[in-house]
Amino acid sequence: MPDSFPTTDMALTHILVVSDVPESNRWYQDVLGAEQYREYETSAVLSFNGVWLLLVGGGDPTPDKPEVLFLPPDARKVSHSFTVRVENCQASYETLKGRGAEFLTPPYDWGGEIRCFFADPDGHLWEISQLTA
C-alpha cells in the first residue's frame, strides 16, 4: 500500500486561540494583509500567503480532544512563533509598523540574519527575518 501521508493536496492550518475573534480578524486583515475566507460566530478562517489561519475564541474539551482546553496565550511565555522570510526586513518593519504592528524592537542585525518580532493582540509572536549571508 502506498504511503498516504503527506500528500500533495494537503494544506497546513494554524489554529490561533484569541480572546476576541472580530478584533483579531480585523488585525490579521489590516496589519498582515490576510484574506478572510469564512467567518463564523466563534471563529474565522483566513488565508495568509498560502497558509490557513483559523482564529478561534477558545473552547472546552471535546470528544476528539478530551483533556485539552483552547486558551489564549500568555504573551510573556512563548512556545510557538511564526517566522516570515522577507527580502528586506527594514522595509517590511516600516510597512507593518505603519499598519499598526507593535514591535518588541526595531530590526536587529545578527550577522547573517536581520530580524525583529511583533505580536498580535493576544500575544501570538511573529518574526520577520531577512537572510543576509
Regions found by a protein language model. Name each.
Residues 23-24, 89-93:
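Short, conserved charged micro-motifs
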Residues 20, 88, 120:
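Acidic di-acidic motifs
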Residues 15-21:
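Conserved beta-strand-loop-alpha-helix junction that forms the acyl-donor binding cleft
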Residues 24-29, 96, 123:
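Conserved active-site tyrosine of GNAT-family acetyltransferases
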